[in-house]
Amino acid sequence: VAPGGGREAGEPLGRHPDVAMVSFTGSTATGRLFLKYAAESNLKRVVLECGGKNPAVVMNDVEDLDLVAQHVVNGAFWNMGENCSASSRLIVHAEVREALLERIGAQLREWRMGDPLDPRNRLGALVSPAHFEKVRAYLDQARTERLAVRFGGATEAGIFVEPTVVDGVSPHSRLFREEIFGPLLSVTSFDDIDEAIALANDTVYGL
């Protein structure tokens, strides 16, 4: 174990001639640095997982919307959405959109926010003040785009952000396209399966 930040641990490992491979999970910017370190040292193998914009696709023939809502909420908001495979995009058939959103709201009302060491709480603070500001900027972006904030959207003392569901998100929106890495679920509706597949695949990320 080599504990430390990027300068103390990451960069030395990336540049060291005796290190044959580095695997990194994190931001695209840092992933590019590891490729640079490898190119400037011993051409070590670099394995990267740099971000995600995972879609949850819900068709109109779904049998149990309550179960779907539970999975969507868990996928989007577990660990405050600070998870590379978080389901941060809900792509839902227009015929069941409203019914599903109602159930998602009911699920979220059961998720209590507070001290993460308290077993009654499901939600805690974000990882850092800097990341809190990044997530808050996306909340501001939703308002700038005049999108419908269906649930949440508020920030609390410290670096807490309510789990937030934003409806009517265009595939051209930053909320649809960029990894937020926080408790913000974007909702985009579709009318047929071909449109759903196209929306799900419309991302630069591998996840």
Residue ranges and their predicted role:
Residues 1-4, 58, 187-191:
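Short acidic-hydrophobic, aromatic-tinged amphipathic segments that line or gate anion-handling sites
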Residues 183:
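Glycine-rich nucleotide-phosphate-binding loops and adjacent flexible coil segments
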Residues 176:
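Short, solvent-exposed loop/beta-turn-alpha elements that line the ligand-binding surface or hinge
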Residues 13, 24, 73-76:
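Conserved N-terminal phosphate-binding loop of PLP-dependent enzymes in the Aspartate aminotransferase
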Residues 29-170, 192-194, 198-201:
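ALDH superfamily catalytic-core signature
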Residues 1-21:
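A structured beta-alpha segment of the ubiquitous adenosine-cofactor-binding alpha/beta core
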Residues 1-3, 23-25, 49-51:
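Short beta-strand segments
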Residues 204-207:
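Short, intrinsically disordered, charge-balanced linker/junction segments flanking boundaries
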